Amino acid sequence: MEQSNFVNMKLSLVPTLLLLLVLLVFYQHHSSPNLNSNALSSFVDATSLAPSPSPSLSMEFSVASSNLSTISSPPENKGNKRNIIEEGLAKSRSAIREAVRLKKFVSDKEETFVPRGAVYRNAFAFHQSHIEMEKKFKVWVYREGETPLVHMGPMNNIYSIEGQFMDEIETGMSPFAANNPEEAHAFLLPVSVANIVHYLYRPLVTYSREQLHKVFLDYVDVVAHKYPYWNRSLGADHFYVSCHDWAPDVSGSNPELMKNLIRVLCNANTSEGFMPQRDVSIPEINIPGGHLGPPRLSRSSGHDRPILAFFAGGSHGYIRRILLQHWKDKDEEVQVHEYLAKNKDYFKLMATARFCLCPSGYEVASPRVVAAINLGCVPVIISDHYALPFSDVLDWTKFTIHVPSKKIPEIKTILKSISWRRYRVLQRRVLQVQRHFVINRPSQPFDMLRMLLHSVWLRRLNLRLP
């Protein structure tokens, strides 16, 4: 009899235990950060700020989802400042939605530049979003670590945007630098991939990423255990910036830990794990010593450009090898050279061409894109898996030509088929987007550094923390 009562008691507990289990799962689901909330698509229609289709990928704007982290669970601490931040972001979403609906912006200061035209996916959404960013966005730079591996990056040559951005945000003069982490919307991991490779891989006797992984993982481990911010969002409001070819490999050190981290990269190769919904594509720019970028030509008509297309560069990667094989020194109109004579000026030749060929090298990005835009030359993107920079807001089909690698033999036919009128429209639009591909120090609204920040801002808008 006693045994029967005991069995009945155990059976009666089963529904209670099941209910507790359901409640536990419900709580865990709602207490984790909402990393898959299509916040942007919910307040702006799909044609506004959603990333563009790249040549090989249709992109939708949503942060990668995640329920688990290899770090400890987020602490239960919903402070007033955090609520204020989330409320401010909600108001920004509403303002952007209204700008799209009413087709006008709202600003509490005079706007010196108003984005308009076909080069923007939705000029009203972009403009209002930029206004909201200028008013609110704050980035906290972790103080841990020492130079040269942390808090310092190259300021010149092709990796320079890494150092320029880090220097801009860390000098204390940037209006986007948070005074304390509690007021920050996003968190910069100021680790320099370029400097890690430069200082720890000399002499270069191995291509193993082990040392790179160790430095980056150690840094994340320190800040994740010292502060609550990484664990709170599972890294989804954290980012790093790098133009080095090895930069995408950082996430390979611990894919589970890094799966929400925003990677701001020049090497935005969708065939190698770049995720436009989460990651940010930035331009590669070659900054010579004593300058902030390549020469700039603000006005030039096609009549001043006798060369149909121009390229000069080494045989780096399979796309360039195909290009040189078909066109090297073979055509007066499509001028393709592996090396230029010493008496030839590279930038002057670009400035006398209507179209500038921008093939991928060993990696997808090329500084020729920025150089071409600054020189008023219509870029011809020759790449198969390149997620183009700032595609959240810029419609690259309106001011560039894309040629997949399989059509390299047809380049002349493709370019000759473009009417004079169509070319002039493309070139005028190239001149229109120049401001977005210029580095200023200090940075200015809508320039390259602000566009980088705006890309991170959009991904933070798309994230709702509990």
From Swiss-Prot:
<feature type="glycosylation site" description="N-linked (GlcNAc...) asparagine">
    <location>
        <position position="67"/>
    </location>
</feature>
<feature type="transmembrane region" description="Helical; Signal-anchor for type II membrane protein">
    <location>
        <begin position="6"/>
        <end position="26"/>
    </location>
</feature>
<keyword id="KW-0328">Glycosyltransferase</keyword>
<dbReference type="InterPro" id="IPR004263">
    <property type="entry name" value="Exostosin"/>
</dbReference>
<dbReference type="GO" id="GO:0000139">
    <property type="term" value="C:Golgi membrane"/>
</dbReference>
<keyword id="KW-0735">Signal-anchor</keyword>
<keyword id="KW-0472">Membrane</keyword>
<dbReference type="GO" id="GO:0016757">
    <property type="term" value="F:glycosyltransferase activity"/>
</dbReference>
<keyword id="KW-1133">Transmembrane helix</keyword>
<feature type="topological domain" description="Lumenal">
    <location>
        <begin position="27"/>
        <end position="466"/>
    </location>
</feature>
<keyword id="KW-0961">Cell wall biogenesis/degradation</keyword>
<dbReference type="Pfam" id="PF03016">
    <property type="entry name" value="Exostosin_GT47"/>
</dbReference>
<comment type="function">
    <text>May be involved in cell wall biosynthesis.</text>
</comment>
<keyword id="KW-0812">Transmembrane</keyword>
<keyword id="KW-0808">Transferase</keyword>
<protein>
    <recommendedName>
        <fullName>Probable glycosyltransferase At5g20260</fullName>
        <ecNumber>2.4.-.-</ecNumber>
    </recommendedName>
</protein>
<dbReference type="GO" id="GO:0006486">
    <property type="term" value="P:protein glycosylation"/>
</dbReference>
<keyword id="KW-0333">Golgi apparatus</keyword>
<comment type="similarity">
    <text>Belongs to the glycosyltransferase 47 family.</text>
</comment>
<feature type="glycosylation site" description="N-linked (GlcNAc...) asparagine">
    <location>
        <position position="231"/>
    </location>
</feature>
<feature type="glycosylation site" description="N-linked (GlcNAc...) asparagine">
    <location>
        <position position="269"/>
    </location>
</feature>
<feature type="topological domain" description="Cytoplasmic">
    <location>
        <begin position="1"/>
        <end position="5"/>
    </location>
</feature>
<dbReference type="GO" id="GO:0071555">
    <property type="term" value="P:cell wall organization"/>
</dbReference>
<keyword id="KW-0325">Glycoprotein</keyword>
<dbReference type="InterPro" id="IPR040911">
    <property type="entry name" value="Exostosin_GT47"/>
</dbReference>
